[in-house]
Amino acid sequence: MSAMEAADVFHRARGRTLDAFSSEKEREWKGPFYFVQGADTQFGLMKAWSTGNCDAGGDEWGQEIRLTEQAVEAINKLNPKPKFFVLCGDLVHAMPGTPWRQEQTRDLQRVLKAVDQDIPLVMVSGNHDLGNAPTAETVEEFCQTWGDDYFSFWVGGVLFLVLNSQFLYDASRCPALKQAQDHWLDQQLNIAEQKQCQHAIVFQHIPLFLQSIDEDDDYFNLTKTVRKELAEKLTRAGIRAVFSGHYHRNAGGTYQNLDMVVSSAIGCQLGKDTHGLRVVAITAEKIVHRYYSLDELSQGGVEEDLKELLKE
């Protein structure tokens, strides 16, 4: 499937928003709802990891196709339907300009085409989607294929912000693009700070931190300077939660009133977690989330206690 054909399938973010949701109609709180978060489908990593060649490996991705198909089937069976399905980056393993990237992308788009048309997809960029040090060209390629790399949208009175976390990791090759996101983010946080929304939530690929705001710098988190500056901005604006991936394990912690949620992968696991998805229920007062293995969600769906929250 070409990028143009994919455009007919996905409500891709354009103009820094997602047209699947009307910002005018969705700005008011209408009661509890839920969404599903996934991360790191990363077609190709399981083969690359198994052979110890993560840089040049990844010439097979049949396992990831089957796992993502299982995730889509599980989501489609959910009742009531989630408001949306967000994929928090590393959609494919092949970096920009490397072998198998087009094939991996085409296969992922084909699998995602099966998501129920009433469940919009929200696509977040990861380091494998843009390169560890993105350029204007790699960002443009992502935008053409999947939609804007950062944007905001409203659902039921909740403001959702999607960030390009590679700009926070290494923007040395595209400083002007980072500045543009920074300026845009300040504008969005101003809306949240004025309490014009019931809650405000951020999606990005790389976590601010894995367990603690004061932890050491690591491949899997943002540097202390960057994370502390961003965490202060987010908490000052009243952001309630940041949902991310990248770690291929479940993790997370809190900073002041901010919940940092790190979800394991649909694809390759690097720890002891199972291939899975996170269900996130939003009520007037709280945000409750739970990670399910693909088998659990396929067979049992959302548990009754979470469903009860949706009736409040």
UniProtKB/Swiss-Prot annotation:
GO terms for cellular component: cytosol; plasma membrane. Residues 47-250 are annotated as: Catalytic. Its cofactor is a divalent metal cation. Its main location: cytoplasm. It is found in: Cytoplasm. A divalent metal cation 1 binds at D90. Keywords: Cytoplasm, Hydrolase, Metal-binding, Phosphoprotein. Protein phosphatase that dephosphorylates AKT family kinase specifically at 'Ser-473', blocking cell cycle progression and promoting cell apoptosis. May play an inhibitory role in glucose uptake by adipocytes. It comes from Mus musculus. One of its GO terms (molecular function) is protein serine/threonine phosphatase activity. Its EC number is 3.1.3.16. A divalent metal cation 2 binds at D90, N127, H246. It is an enzyme of class 3 (hydrolase). It holds the Pfam family Metallophos. This is Serine/threonine-protein phosphatase CPPED1. Binds 2 divalent metal cations. The modification Phosphoserine is found at S2, S293. Belongs to the metallophosphoesterase superfamily. CPPED1 family. The gene is Cpped1. The keyword Metal-binding applies. It catalyses: O-phospho-L-seryl-[protein] + H2O = L-seryl-[protein] + phosphate; O-phospho-L-threonyl-[protein] + H2O = L-threonyl-[protein] + phosphate.
